[in-house]
Amino acid sequence: MLGTLALGILAGPALAQSMPSGAEGETAQSAPASPLPPAIASLRAQDARVLDLGYRLTTGNARFCHHDRTASAGLLLHDMAAYGDGATLRDLLGLEGDVGVQALVPGGPAERAGLRVDDTVLAIGDMNIADIAMEDDKRWQRIETIREAAEDLLQDTGTLPLTVARPDGPLRIVIAGTPACRSRFEIGEGGRAVADGHRVVIGPEFAAIDYSDPLLAAVLAHEFAHNLLHHRAWFDANGGRKRKAVRLTEREADRLMPWLLANAGFEPQAAAQFFEKWGPRHGGWIFRARSHDGWDERVDFIEEEIARMNALGSADWSQHFQHEELPGDVSVPGR
């Protein structure tokens, strides 16, 4: 973890109830009914950016994810029911129902299939949104049900059929997913960047959230590495987060960063550049904690990995990455 000690398939504000987000630039987008307030527009741009960077990481590394490969549709959905004033937000976005397209990867599978930001989603496959039960004290649960259904469809069939509302009536769109490693990327709350084994969540207050794309991708790659290396499962199987093991898993995630970045189309050096920019500003905090190597040591480990990649002429981490020897008795599949 980078922020504290602790899809790009489809996501929503299940835990964090983040503000809605959408794509920028050339992404197909329906005009909101009214201009969005600056705070909402800013968070929408953040969420779209994280979606895009996560998509690049998961799809770029898909051929090396032998244990956790799925397909990505390159979109985020959100549910107005998960927000404090969902009715007002729904009107602002011009939605005809509660579930809408929050963001699209520019040029990604969903956009190529004809989906638009702020499309109203009526059904996922054969599951009608209106038929999903929702408890008043768990209004976030509906978007999780939708997410799970979408992920199951993409895993089983490689496609995601959606029905959306259009002026001429409901339109069924079938999205052909792109092979991807299994991890969702989403905006959460606060100032942390964390991974839980299946998701990468970064808060809008994270100090590096406004860094350049390559450096923010490095942050996401670090958390993504925790998922790919099954660190959460390893801790669960070996008695929790003991300091020595935490230090080694953090080092292992650091070392995998340049491999993941290279396969996503970024310069692997961005991993070292992130720590060189971040470390001096935060050197008295987590980067000098005994559970983590110092930021300058982390740069050295990354530079060694880049040299190894250059010597190999390959970024195939599934074959060439050398795992740390973790001090536990229970092995975990995929490590």
Residue ranges and their predicted role:
Residues 100-103:
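Short beta-strand segments of a lipoyl-like beta-sandwich/carrier module
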Residues 2-12:
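Bacterial N-terminal signal peptides
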Residues 218-231, 253:
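Active-site recognition of the HExxH zinc-binding catalytic motif
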Residues 105-109:
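Short alpha-helix capping/helix-loop boundary micro-motifs
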Residues 25-38, 127-128, 198-204, 233-241:
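Acidic/histidine-rich, surface-exposed loop or edge segments in extracytoplasmic proteins
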Residues 17-80, 87-95, 141-142, 148-156, ...:
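C-terminal capping/extension segments of zinc metalloprotease domains
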Residues 110-138:
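Conserved PDZ fold ligand-binding element
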